Amino acid sequence: MTFQAIATHPQDWTGDTLALGLTTAAIGETLSSELQKLDQQWNGVLQELISDSEFKAKLAETTTTRIGGSIRKLILVGLGESPTTEDYRRAAAAVAKQARSFKSQTLAIAFPPSDDPAAIASAIVEGISLALYKDQRFKSEPDTASGPSSIELLGLAGQEAAIARAEQVVAGVELARQLVAAPANVVTPVTMADTAQELAAELGLELEILEADECEKRGMGAFLGVAKASDLPPKFIHLTYRPESTPRRKLAIVGKGLTFDSGGYNIKGAGSGIEMMKTDMGGAAATLGAAKAIGLIKPDVEVHFISAVTENMISGRGMHPGDILTASNGKTIEVNNTDAEGRLTLADALVFADGLGVDAIVDLATLTGACIIALGDDIAGLWSPSDDLAEQLLQAGKAAGEKLWRLPLEEPYLDGLKSPVADYKNTGPRAGGSITAALFLKQFVKHPVWAHLDVAGPVWSDKEKHYNPAGATGYGVRTLVNWVLS
């Protein structure tokens, strides 16, 4: 699938399928003057289609017809009243799915002129590419139906750089989707390390992988406490992108990397969704996806991508409820629930990131069911002691169409994590569980410019939503890239 930005007007384009994006104002009591010209050329087909289909130009609403001549199909897609970048993305996705159903080989898409044509071009590329993504790796008879092979963005000549950047971001999202969607017998800690090695070789990134013995030397008792039950070796991954010039800032991104979570001795029971615990490395997947995108884009920012990767299993070597672990900053943790393991692995990863001398740290993790209860499946939670960093991430997420909601770091709640035998317990009371989880992580970060994203809900969708097919969404990659580039 190739994208090309051209100056051609819709009335002069020829090919399989032409899509026009229309606002509600453009089809008011009378068509806009621009649409009237097209309607005259097409012998009234446009007005007839709008009237007969009762098309109202609601966001992502579509209607189609044949118009004959040099164009086989016409798609009208609604943009709503005052379209945002996310609206353009969703409208483009709706067009892509229609064009695929028509088996169109060539597609042109024309949206109304804007004072930010680069944003529109990027939104079209992201919306179409992400909507048409298919993961057929594990099918014995893969579905070979694909979308158009050639897509032209009309009226957007000169936006080649925006198209290229959007394709680079999409490549990162697709990597994250593939990692999250694959089962735990395919994506293991070793697989994640191999993926990091491939990225390093492909993109010229620096790579450090700490094996268990090196992690032990560094005092990573919290991470290794989780890892010791698994027969698969843990991998502590540290990828670094360094620009050729002096970086304008240095950042660290830390992703939770549990390739499977059984719950340990606090095992997940029937109805717990244990079969979906392959997704518990969604934070690490987004981290590697962001590494791919950043490595392709090559901004003037130094970025460290970190993940402590392991499984949480059950064996004679496994940690017991009540065990006390010592993290690499010397803090001791009473494990009162082995199924709250992600925060243990993150503890040592955050201590590591904190020692890199970066300007800001962001971690993201499929950390708590409590966050899903609070915010639902589509919104990630955001905690940060830094108002500036929180606002940067909120704006980055808004531009990406990835929803974030800031929640409080309510310090008095930390009392619920106090242990009579260690510095902290790894879980507190049921109430405010996502907040106490964030407060737990805060004990392992001295840096004041830190944020925690709980992405437990949006990394996976059971049904198709806009440009996200059912399954892994790749959530977080586009927000992280926007943040790095901001």
Swiss-Prot record:
Cofactor(s) this protein requires: Mn(2+)
Major localisation: cytoplasm
Keywords annotated in UniProt: Aminopeptidase, Cytoplasm, Hydrolase, Manganese, Protease
EC number, UniProt record: 3.4.11.1, 3.4.11.10
Pfam families named among the record's database cross-references: Peptidase_M17, Peptidase_M17_N
Single GO term (MF): manganese ion binding
Free-text remark on how the cofactor is bound: Binds 2 manganese ions per subunit.
Role of this protein: Presumably involved in the processing and regular turnover of intracellular proteins. Catalyzes the removal of unsubstituted N-terminal amino acids from various peptides.
Entry's family note: Belongs to the peptidase M17 family.
Cited PANTHER family: CYTOSOL AMINOPEPTIDASE, LEUCINE AMINOPEPTIDASE-RELATED
Name used for this protein in its record: Probable cytosol aminopeptidase
Name of the coding gene: pepA
